[in-house]
Amino acid sequence: MNNCRQNLENFDPEVFGYLNDEIKRQEEHIELIASENFVSKAVLETMGTELTNKYAEGYPGKRYYGGCEHVDKIEQLAIDRLKKLFNADHANVQPHCGANANIAVYVAVLKPGDTVLGMRLTEGGHLTHGSPVNMSGKFYNFVDYGVDPETGTIDYENVRELALKHKPKLIVAGASAYPRIIDFKKFREIADEVGAYLMVDMAHIAGLVATGDHPSPVPYADFVTTTTHKTLRGPRGGAILCKEEHKKLLDKSVFPGFQGGPLEHIIAAKAVCFKEDLQPEFKEYTHQILKNAKAMEKVFLDNDVRLVSGGTDNHLLLIDCRSFGMTGKEAENVLSEVNITTNKNTIPNDPETPFVTSGIRIGTPAITTRGLKEAEATKVAEFMIDALKKRRPAEEIKNDVVELMKQFPINR
């Protein structure tokens, strides 16, 4: 029991050392992975509280364990704040992640073998939108739609044709690598035409939706799933919004249908995050995300770099690395050497495998959290061009990156 009184540094210096290495990496690197962000001190603090000790199966006021009177209040706060943030009828804040949120909706409205329409992974979708390597693709009959090969944007007429042909029980809208505005009203019209439920996965754009920087799916979708990190800038976790008539069905699907005990320390951190997202400053933040993405877009286009769909309407850009005569994997490695973190990503009609790819995906949420604005975002894009076109020595670019990021410390 004496071990319980020791701090991390004293009890496990090995883990403590690796933790500090990661903190140093985050400080000295430019984080451009579109799904990553930096949480506030308040969110970080909440995740490390004694709430992690508490089991609380069930929902506020209806638990299977005693001693839940305080976590009930916290979880209800998270629910109420999330509903207010998106003007939603109902919210479930228990999903451990975005994938769990998606699967919970499937469990709620589908039976194994039911037909679902979802976006093709290689053209911007997500593993849980029916990829054959994911349980969604194994349990359900997913028919996939993609983007127009010329424009790189969703072909809504093709979506409609597929829906009319296959009569899906559920249509899934939303993406993990799509840089343009999604027309949720069109998806609703298609769903209504074939009598399907509509689920929107807004994990990537949730922060933008909350502030009006992207149209909201909430008025149109039966279910809306999201992560709570990414553009919401909260702890790693998931959440689901739904219409009032689906409330009981959804809650039963999350628990006991798909999950057991909720992570109340994470739910508390979600509550803190949602309070942050309701502040006026959060609107300024999401507006700046878009400004920074546009600033980077200009640099790439001015340097004859091909961007999928020709640019961006949101927080992310999808870069065709064949513009530099290399694969996405090679580009990711080149940028990593100069302390710029990205991820290789498939692009429409990609001739490479998912482990190699022809593209990289970048996003501006994390650098915007650190305080970078258009001038610095422009500089970051120029660093990328310099590295990928080998205009300057890698060590010189890396030094410039480290010096730039010293001006924008994390959580200071």
UniProtKB/Swiss-Prot annotation:
EC number: 2.1.2.1
Essential cofactor(s): pyridoxal 5'-phosphate
Binding locations of (6S)-5,6,7,8-tetrahydrofolate: L121, G125, H126, L127, T353, P354, F355
Coarse class of the protein's main subcellular location: cytoplasm
N6-(pyridoxal phosphate)lysine: modified positions: K230
Coiled coil: none
Top-tier EC class: transferase
Annotated site, Plays an important role in substrate specificity, chain positions: H229
Record-level Gene Ontology MF annotations: glycine hydroxymethyltransferase activity; pyridoxal phosphate binding
Pathway: One-carbon metabolism; tetrahydrofolate interconversion; Amino-acid biosynthesis; glycine biosynthesis; glycine from L-serine: step 1/1
Catalytic activity reported: (6R)-5,10-methylene-5,6,7,8-tetrahydrofolate + glycine + H2O = (6S)-5,6,7,8-tetrahydrofolate + L-serine
Places the protein is found: Cytoplasm
Gene Ontology cellular component list: cytosol
Keywords: Amino-acid biosynthesis, Cytoplasm, One-carbon metabolism, Pyridoxal phosphate, Transferase
Gene Ontology biological process: glycine biosynthetic process from serine; tetrahydrofolate interconversion
Superkingdom to which the source organism belongs: Bacteria
Oligomer status and interactors: Homodimer.
Similarity annotation: Belongs to the SHMT family.
NCBIfam families: PRK00011.1 (NF000586)
Role according to the record: Catalyzes the reversible interconversion of serine and glycine with tetrahydrofolate (THF) serving as the one-carbon carrier. This reaction serves as the major source of one-carbon groups required for the biosynthesis of purines, thymidylate, methionine, and other important biomolecules. Also exhibits THF-independent aldolase activity toward beta-hydroxyamino acids, producing glycine and aldehydes, via a retro-aldol mechanism.
Protein name per Swiss-Prot or TrEMBL: Serine hydroxymethyltransferase
Species of the source: Finegoldia magna (strain ATCC 29328 / DSM 20472 / WAL 2508)
Taxonomic lineage from the root: Bacteria, Bacillati, Bacillota, Tissierellia, Tissierellales
